[in-house]
Each structure stands twice: as C-alpha cells, then as structure tokens.
Amino acid sequence: MFAPRLLDFQKTKYARFMNHRVPAHKRYQPTEYEHAANCATHAFWIIPSILGSSNLYFLSDDDWETISAWIYGLGLCGLFVVSTVFHTISWKKSHLRMVEHCLHMFDRMVIYFFIAASYAPWLNLRELGPWASHMRWLVWIMASVGTIYVFFFHERTGSCVQFLRGEACPKAGTACLPARYKLVELLCYVVMGFFPALVILSMPNTEGIWELVTGGVFYCLGMVFFKSDGRIPFAHAIWHLFVAFGAGTHYYAIWRYLYLPSTLQTKVSK
C-alpha cells in the first residue's frame, strides 16, 4: 500500500484509466477500461484450468487421487468462472441489482472453497500426523464459516431479504458496506490461507514446499493491489494476475509432486 503514496496516478496521464478512490464503506466503481481488464484477466484462465484439472484426473491412480483431482479442479475452475461472470454482469448488466449482488457474494464465497480445494490434494494424498489429519475436514468447516459470514455481512447493514428486494437501508444515510466487515473478510482469507499451511510444512515429505511458499507470496503481493482501487490503475485486474500466478504455481506443485511421480513409475493413463 506504500507504492501508491509515492506516486499519485490521479495526477498523471494514467488517471483516465481509473476513477477516484472511494471511502472504505463504499464500493469502488471501475472505469470501462478496468471493467474489461477485470473480465479478461480471469476469463483467460478458464480453459487452462479446465485442461489442467482434466490432466490431474487422467493421471489419478486410485480413488483418493481421483476425488482430490475433482475437488481441486472444481475449486480452481469455479474461481475463474464465477469471477468472470460476476465482473461481466457488473460491467454490462449493472442495472440487474439483485443478480449483480448475488454474483458478488458468490465471487467472495468461492474464494473460501478455492482455498480449501487447493489444500485438498496435499491433505488427502500426503502422510499426516494424528493431529494434522483433522485439517482435512477443518479446512472445509472454515470455508463454510466464511461463506456464512459473507451471506450475512457482505455489502449491507440491513437484512439480506431487504437488500435483495431492493429496499433501502433501514437507516437513511448510513453506509451499506461497513469498512470493518470488509477488513474482517480480508483477515478471514489470510487466516484460512495460512493456517492449513502449518500442517503442510510439518509433513515428513517436504517436496513441493518451496512452490507452495512461492504461490503464497504471489497471493500476498496481490493483496496490495486488491486494496488499491482508485490508487493504482487496473489494481483489481493486477490482483487477478497475481491470483493466476499463485494458482498456477500451486497447480504445478500438485501436478509435479502428487501426481506425476506415480505416473512416471507405474501406470497407464485411464
């Protein structure tokens, strides 16, 4: 967040690519350029994610590998598909307020399940200690809790039913997007992203650890841009790219260290 302070893009020729920053309790409205970039930067990865997920499925040797490939693939593809659909509707059909709101909620919810799905192959296919094995189901509880939080606190102070009916906030003049809820949501993503990693790092087999760390660094760097709408042009699209780089690095680790070795040694593909 320090970089934007060093350079005020609103005073440069790049100002036309972004709107002014809004208060923390309001949602930033992207420019037409930013809308297009937000859609393209995740739409581009839909086909590769489908192909990559299919590759893991065909490399699977047993039921656990197959199940893990399905879980991870659905989480990976779901992330890019839901994000692309939401940003497209937000750009071209913003007058469909209820549809846009629901898709925005799904866009936030799917992140929790993507995080859980990204850990699934490691937790299902690697040897775990007695206490660490509980993380297999704990990570899904965390994703469910995050989803419930989004449902009740995303972009409103009034009830979900009131918002979806198009009714005004119960208190005129109050913010419908409390800043504290956005901060808690971001902290939830960070905690859920790092907490299961403690188990991964404690596994006897440490192959793939550096790739996992590298992917995590991409996500962390991307968060700088995630919170920089109105400060940096195309900030959200840049965040999308960091997500794609992080996901790609983690995919490589899963493919290389959980699926490829057994393929080279033992089997014929399905």
From Swiss-Prot:
Transmembrane segments: 39-59, 66-86, 103-123, 133-153, 183-203, 206-226, 234-254
Membrane side Cytoplasmic: residue ranges: 1-38, 87-102, 154-182, 227-233
Lumenal domain ranges by topology: 60-65, 124-132, 204-205, 255-270
Tissue: Shows restricted expression with highest levels in brain and testis.
Keywords: Golgi apparatus, Membrane, Receptor, Transmembrane, Transmembrane helix
Any one GO BP annotation for this protein: positive regulation of Ras protein signal transduction
Molecular function per GO: protein kinase activity
InterPro entries: AdipoR/HlyIII-related
Top-level taxon in the UniProt lineage: Eukaryota
Bilayer disposition of the protein: Multi-pass membrane protein
Pfam family, one: HlyIII
UniProt keyword Heme, yes or no: no
Example of a GO cellular component annotation carried by this entry: Golgi membrane
Compartments in which it is found: Golgi apparatus membrane
Entry's family note: Belongs to the ADIPOR family.
Name of this protein: Monocyte to macrophage differentiation factor 2
Gene (name only): MMD2
